[in-house]
């Protein structure tokens, strides 16, 4: 068993349960037993509310044979877009993260290698990929980060995962830690 996506995204959190040893999510009936959590037949977990405690997901074999499969996880970071309409200077966006803070570019994605940003657990873009595919929450072309080089803050591209030095206005992104 393995888990991906330890970060919340926008107003809804999704997490895909991964099984090993030729096991299939569709062979199990999934339950969480907590309000605000839904697990579909493909093993995708959706949290419609932020749950700060550890979450346990249980899969019972549909054929009644074999052991239950149990997944446990806890949200460590919750990322929220201030929306594409929040386009403003870095200083104004930074003060808009009153319930958290602006993330660093390395929390959002690793640096590209050969022009490609790696997809792997540990960063928001690494776990979710193109954030623009998740609806209007990440529809802006770029977002300010807390990362600063030579006195200039970086902007993060939610489509490519690449951060570059930026000026002018951009949208806001905040992160809360748990």
Residue ranges and their predicted role:
Residues 2-13:
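Single conserved hydrophobic/aromatic residue that forms the stacking wall/gate
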Residues 33-50, 161:
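Strand-loop-strand motifs at the edges of beta-sheets in extracellular beta-sandwich domains
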Residues 51, 66-68, 96-97, 135-139, ...:
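Extracellular/periplasmic catalytic domains that process cell-envelope and extracellular macromolecules
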Residues 51-57:
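Exposed beta-strand face motif in extracellular beta-rich ectodomains
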Residues 57-59, 64, 69-77, 144, ...:
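Short, structured beta-strand segments at or near domain termini in extracellular proteins/domains
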Residues 76-148:
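Conserved hydrophobic ligand-interaction patch in extracellular adhesion modules
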Residues 85-95, 152-165:
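Short, polar loop/linker segments at the starts of domains and inter-domain junctions
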């Amino acid at each position: 068993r393995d888990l991906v996506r330890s970060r919340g995204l926008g107003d809804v959190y999704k997490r895909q349960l991964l099984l090993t040893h030729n096991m299939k999510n569709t062979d199990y009936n999934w339950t969480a037993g907590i309000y605000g959590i839904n697990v579909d037949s493909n093993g995708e977990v959706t949290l419609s509310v932020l749950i700060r405690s550890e979450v346990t997901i249980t899969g019972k074999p549909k054929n009644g044979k074999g052991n239950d499969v149990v997944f446990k996880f806890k949200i460590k970071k919750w990322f929220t877009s201030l929306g594409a309409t929040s386009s403003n200077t870095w200083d104004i966006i930074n003060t808009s993260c009153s319930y958290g803070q602006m993330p660093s570019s390395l929390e959002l994605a690793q640096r590209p290698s050969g022009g490609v940003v790696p997809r792997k657990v540990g960063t928001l873009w690494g776990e979710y990929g193109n954030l623009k595919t998740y609806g209007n929450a990440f529809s802006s072309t770029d977002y300010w980060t807390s990362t600063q080089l030579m006195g200039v803050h970086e902007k993060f591209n939610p489509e490519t995962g690449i951060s570059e030095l930026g000026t002018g206005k951009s949208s806001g992104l905040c992160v809360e830690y748990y």
